[in-house]
Amino acid sequence: SWLTQQAGSNNNSNGTVALGAQYTDNSGNYNARFWGYQFDNYGTLMYGDGTINFPIKGSKNSFSFAAQFATDQQWLQASNAMTNAATGAGNIQSYVAGVNLGWAYDTNLWQVNLSADTMWGPDNAWGGGAIVSPYTQALQVDPVYTEAWSYNMVTQGQPGNMYKAQAQYALGWWGQNLLFRPVYVYVANNNPATNGLQELDLILNYAIPQVRGLNVFGAYAQQWYSPNANNDPALGSTVPNGNYQPIEIQASIFYTW
């Protein structure tokens, strides 16, 4: 379990209350979103982002700029599952900010995105300023721009900085149904195991045109831990079994509607 439970503590949740809003102008070039989650027994997460697109008149090129901000707090709750389960754990208090610069040609045909995120909080807060997102933990669907397939700051509960370069290309005669996405991320934080971590992801997604919503998906992810990374479990290492170059491969078929 990602949360170790001590005797007498409670890591259950009675549910979540969520509220969100989104605005897009008539041109589709400006978009803003805001949402909030009240996680019972875990905290309150607030998130907002905005994107501006700059299409180049007379060409298929466009540029974009996006920014995001999030905060996770222990509002409306006297305690939470983490502080109850761990001796000396601090309250939830985390902040995240990020930017993304993008270029696209013919929408999905070619894309390049460069992004950076920083997560911080007081040293005496839970995880030194980590975000708590219990219902997306380990699902890799948290909205930070620099999320990688195998590592992101929310899932690992590790504040710090992340940098990401991502491209997208619609492959050949398959048209825009078969998308290839290479991704590179770099991690810079105060964690003795993951500081300097690098990850390369190669992702394929094919939307089967004959069946609307049916997709074939594949992912290859490889990480390189810093040669100086701590691999002592007693010191909180996350280097998996001393493996400094772990590989993850996944393939799936999924349907959305």
Predicted segment positions?
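Flexible, surface-exposed loop regions and adjacent strand-edge segments
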Residues: 82-86, 129-138, 196-199, 233-244
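C-terminal beta-signal and adjacent terminal beta-strands/loops
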Residues: 216-237
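Extracellular loop and loop/strand-boundary signature of outer-membrane beta-barrel proteins
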Residues: 3-7, 36, 81-88, 149-154, ...
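A C-terminal functional module that forms or caps the active site or interfaces directly
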Residues: 161, 176-217
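Solvent-exposed loop/turn segments connecting transmembrane beta-strands
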Residues: 11-15, 37-47, 157-161, 188-198, ...
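Detector for outer-membrane/organellar transmembrane beta-barrel domains
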Residues: 24, 29, 49-188
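Internal metal/ion-chelating core segments
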Residues: 1-53
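Outer-membrane beta-barrel "beta-signal"
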Residues: 19, 165, 243-257
